[in-house]
Amino acid sequence: MFEEMTEQQAREQILEMTKEYCEKYHNQKKPYKKGDRIPYASRVYDADEMVNLVDSSLEFWLTSGRFTKEFESEFAKYLGVKYCSLVNSGSSANLLAFMALTSPLLKERQILPGDEVITVAAGFPTTVAPVIQYGAVPVFVDVAIPQYNIDPNLLEQAVSEKTKAVMLAHTLGNPFDLKAVKDFCDRHNLWLIEDNCDALGSRYTIDGESRLTGTIGDIGTS
């Protein structure tokens, strides 16, 4: 099949066939009919992503490489932030974000075992898991209904001399009260970690400026 081709020509043909394959067998949308199952979550991808997957595989590059660097650069531009690190999941992102705050380079603001971190009582376990994994103590605050985000009126009751950070998720795409939480963190000199994995693309207006969620705290995961 590839006898008369250069490696680049063979690669281009494979990628073109991959695109056609995806469009024919993966991306055909069937009209909904009564009784069809509606999944609450599923894989979301298109032909471009499948082509990139195969393109990377042809080099047998199975870890971070040129696509990773390109994505980190473009994603940082989209968010309007200086740094972006790509990982395999939101759970890993939360773990990495929290680990960064345990660095001795932070001196008196370093999160140590036994320090307290305020979070919600009804939320994602992957928001709380890093706190426990690094030996810190989660301090749970109730949520407000129907947003299922933190009730900022309860924050002052949760703070102590051991509190070092607040780690919260924007639940189901609904931003929590960033203004109130950010003011609270600034007042008490606390880190604010935004778990933005459920809300990428959501915006919040703070101090008259509309900003993407995940970019207002000290660290954000998306």
Language model features by range: what are they?
Residues 64-68, 90-94, 123-124, 148, ...:
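Conserved donor sugar-nucleotide recognition element shared by glycan-biosynthetic enzymes
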Residues 42-43, 171, 222:
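Conserved donor-binding loops in enzymes that form glycosidic bonds
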Residues 66-116, 129-134, 140:
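Phosphate-binding glycine-rich loop
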Residues 40, 200, 213-216:
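Short clusters of hydrophobic/aromatic residues that line enzyme substrate/ligand-binding pockets
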Residues 1-62:
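N-terminal "arm"/small-domain region of PLP-dependent enzymes with the aminotransferase-like
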Residues 21-22, 103-208:
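PLP-dependent aminotransferase-like
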Residues 216-222:
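Active-site PLP attachment segment
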